[in-house]
Amino acid sequence: MKKGFRGTGTVERVDFPNKGIAVTDDGDRVIVKNTIPGQKVEFVVNKVKHQRAEGRLMEVIEKSPLETEEPCPHFGMCGGCTYQTVPYEKQLDMKLTQVKKLISDAIGTEKEAGYEFIGIHGSPKKSEYRNKMEFSFGDEYKDGPLALGMHKRGSFYDLVTVSDCQIVDEDFRTILKATLDYFSKNNIPYFHRATHKGYLRHLLVRKATKTGEIIVDLVTSTQTEGFNEEELLAGFRYELLTRHYDGRFKGVLHTKNDSVADVVKNEGTEVLYGDSYFYEELLGLKFKITPFSFFQTNSLGAEVLYETAREFILGDDKDSLNGKTVYDLYSGTGTIAQLMAPVCKEVVGVEIVEEAVCAAKENAALNGLDNCKFIAGDVLKVLDEIEEKPDYIILDPPRDGIHPKAIGKIIEYGVENMVYISCKPTSLARDLQIFMDRGYRVEKICCVDMFPNTYHIETIVALHRTDL
């Protein structure tokens, strides 16, 4: 099969991350992303490497028997969701199957390696679950009208105005529509990714699930030729605050960003209304959140994730960490550290993002926890500098997993038990092989779905040292 070949096939299965395996009538297998098991699809081969063909999806010729749900009106064009047409229980089955295959291919099956795969916990909310959205300004086609939303699937430039997005609630949709209407009416240009000309860049919206507090941050360039920016922003603030919401506005912000990269970068933020932060609650703790804070995007799902992790850590003995020191590596804003602090002597969190460390310290003080210590720095380097030795280690690395050299240093502590929380199963499978080769065994595994209708999945693993 050569590059440029156009063919059809039936999707046999979907492997993580979102890689459909389509089988042609001749028995050839082609990887086609954004597909669902059972679909008959048309594809064009765009890559052949090591005799493995990858194709771009051209058309779904026949739906899968799994597809029984009515999707969001933007589904298919929007690059956000992948499984919206599949009932939620089937989505969970698909994700569980994908993770089980990756883990068993890496370290063996449950029977071979002696671990327990508990299953998968679903999200408490299947729709309208996100507490944060980052919308982009642009157009739906070249020289088209202003759009505000998500990138079209497979496109860097074109956008879809997701005014009926189903993974956020009505307040998000109201804010998007109000913003688009206002700037369209005033003929304000968006920042073009190719020419680097224009004003409007991104709209960041956050809403606390528990408190209902909302902050909106308009991200723009500093190119204000042709209009009075102060008057424009005053009108924008008025447009937002005069609409009806189920939640309540805590702040309207304006961030300047002249970076040529298509990312939200803070080069200065001013408060147009209210405050630059709000509060969210998780498992009885309060967290102060700014527009750029890292925080799990599904608050109710995060409670399931962290409660499951806490059960893995403590087991049947709720006093097992009394008088002990816990390392929380890749600690982010310190959520797990603060949940564990009441049951241990001290928690030491290490995180490379300084803003997240500052937030962790502030949140620990907010929750009256004086036995949490947070250090800003690379885990690989910081581990050489910490004097306290851990009795237990919690790992919650970014998508790429743990640097092999850092794994070596972690293993050298020789702690009896660890918990690994992963947001990318492929990285997890790779890292587990290293831990098992160096004297640890996997005791139990559980998946938690934080992202319904997408292919993303969280996995929690309990590790136990075998050579003590």
Task: Give the predicted meaning of each segment.
Residues E59-E70, G79-Y190, K210:
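Extended interfacial segments that mediate partner engagement and assembly in macromolecular machines
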Residues M1-H74, K111, R153, K373, ...:
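Terminal RNA-binding accessory module
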